[in-house]
Amino acid sequence: MAGSWRARGSLVVLAILLFGCLFAISIAKEEATKLGTVIGIDLGTTYSCVGVYKNGHVEIIANDQGNRITPSWVGFTDGERLIGEAAKNQAAVNPERTIFDVKRLIGRKFEDKEVQKDMKLVPYKIVNKDGKPYIQVKIKDGETKVFSPEEISAMILIKMKETAEAFLGKKIKDAVVTVPAYFNDAQRQATKDAGIIAGLNVARIINEPTAAAIAYGLDKKGGEKNILVFDLGGGTFDVSILTIDNGVFEVLSTNGDTHLGGEDFDMRIMEYFIKLIKKKHGKDISKDNRAIGKLRREAERAKRALSSQHQVRVEIESLFDGVDFSEPLTRARFEELNNDFVQKDHGTREEAMEDAGLAKNQIDEIVLVGGSTRIPKVQQLLKDYFDGKEPNKGVNPDEAVAYGAAVQGSILSGEGGEETKDILLLDVAPLTLGIETVGGVMTKLIPRNTVIPTKKSQVFTTYQDQQTTVSIQVFEGERSLTKDCRNLGKFDLTGVPPAPRGTPQIEVTFEVDANGILNVKAEDKGTGKSEKITITNDKGRLSQEEIDRMVQEAEEFAEEDKKVKERIDARNTLETYVYNMKNQVNDKDKLADKLESDEKDKIESAVKDALEWLDDNQSAEKEDYDEKLKEVEAVCNPIITAVYQRSGGAPGGGSGEEDEDSESHDEL
């Protein structure tokens, strides 16, 4: 374990008596004995991705549709729950019951301005429950349920977990999950809770740009390099500047916006066309969820196409009132619509450069991450800023984050072997952490961009005579007054012996772990009495009881999903058998010429009856399909056996050794 220690002491004669000791510990290796295979999951706003380190390299795992990225969408129908492509593909016809962009809600409060803005843009219903945004949706049979953002995120995590399990052929319990570097404490805690609900031990939360840097730098040997990771995804944006030196990845600075990404670009296209439709047709479609769903789908397609074309035509059949929509969109118009977003991205980059203390010519590589970095204007502005320097194209922007997470997983599990044993991550706290002191002042204990894990203690004193309770209010943010920062939580240290103001000594300790999550402790140095919290309910985190309930419900959903799949499989088995029999009795090369007329009549009658039954019983249970299959087999199988026996034990007649193989291949 490598460590660096710094200490300083000072005395402030106002409201605060100050004594500080700061240390940062960098962990090269984790205790890996208790972890199995640790997968890496990029839990994205619009798409998610999963990887695993196996046989000396990272495998990015394709889902059951053959795609290496999975839409972060969840849908509910009267019959089942859908996740991924299946959910996204039915969104236009089922908008109120299809949930997406939940990463923009996780860890936030209902009254946050971003949540209030998003409520107007999504077709599903967001409601206030205990100050948190919950999603209200009809799940089945008219039953309405509210889900926390953590529960919906857990459903996506379960999908990624199952994708990995299908590939690896074993159960997975451990994962590294990535978050935007600029996610605050509440958002990180909520992401960890989502993992618990999904039945995962989240072995580590790591920052997306840091994970992408691993993907870039894993095989890079040689001297020190400064890299800038520009991560513009579907819903969030980060810039991180790192130094890479022979496997040591040290984050120098990070900056970002947890509510800026490709979804915002799509929305600008949609707003443009909504205004155009109103002007041309006198119709406001903004409250028509189906029309908006269709428009959202085509806006995303148009945006993607404009990365390689200068003009696209957006065409939607019967968008509203039977009216077909067809309008051109040029790249120039798209860039104009989103100019303020793109400029904001590059302002964030300049702040990160300033915090890192580097000049433009000291950046050796620019690594692009996230699908939105494919936008030509984004790339052009980066090139212009760095005096014509081309961004590195060697990293897949959709997969780099999951790739790096999988490498980190292999380090934690010990399965990375020689290839990963020398990798060391030194990440940072993205936001300044502190407490409120007299006058609403934000007294900073851990400055932003401090290497984590880290610990800092300061001694405070009382403001009033005979004060017996000290309230500790914890904040994060960069402003000098707490009213302009985010309140993470509050707790009281009681039982302080009455004394004149300035006499008691209350030591407050802030500790940020390797996940970027904060623990706070306050201790009365005179009595030894202490209180501590991992900031919880004050910031809207789920209680342990809520998490336990959600874990139980997630398991129940998984059981229901299993039953739905078994029912579909049973129906498919019956249908396949029946259609196979129908084809066999009508094919001269198979059974048609070998059946007696009464045998053919019996099979055809059984097949006709089964097909009619299937039409009349679309939502039968698995047991019903199994029973029906047995009925049909009871009629058909004895006849098929008799036919084979008449023709010498093999279909098509003849006998002898040369036919033995064909017999085994043609069993019905």
Curated annotation (Swiss-Prot):
Pfam families, A to Z: HSP70
Residues annotated as binding ATP: 44-47, 103, 234-236, 300-307, 371-374
Record-stated family: Belongs to the heat shock protein 70 family.
Tissue expression per record: Expressed in pollen and nuts (at protein level).
Natural source organism: Corylus avellana (European hazel)
Subcellular location: Endoplasmic reticulum lumen
Record carries keyword Kinase: no
Chain intervals for the UniProt region annotation (Disordered): 644-668
GO cellular component terms, A-Z: endoplasmic reticulum lumen
GO molecular function: ATP binding; ATP hydrolysis activity; ATP-dependent protein folding chaperone
Function: Probably plays a role in facilitating the assembly of multimeric protein complexes inside the ER.
EC number annotated for this UniProt entry: 3.6.4.10
Cited InterPro entries: ATPase_NBD, BIP_NBD, Heat_shock_70_CS, HSP70_C_sf, HSP70_peptide-bd_sf, Hsp_70_fam
Signal peptide location: 1-28
Catalyzed reactions per annotation: ATP + H2O = ADP + phosphate + H(+)
Enzyme category, top tier: hydrolase
The protein's name: Endoplasmic reticulum chaperone BiP
Extent of motif Prevents secretion from ER: 665-668
GO BP field: pollen development; pollen germination; pollen tube growth; protein folding in endoplasmic reticulum
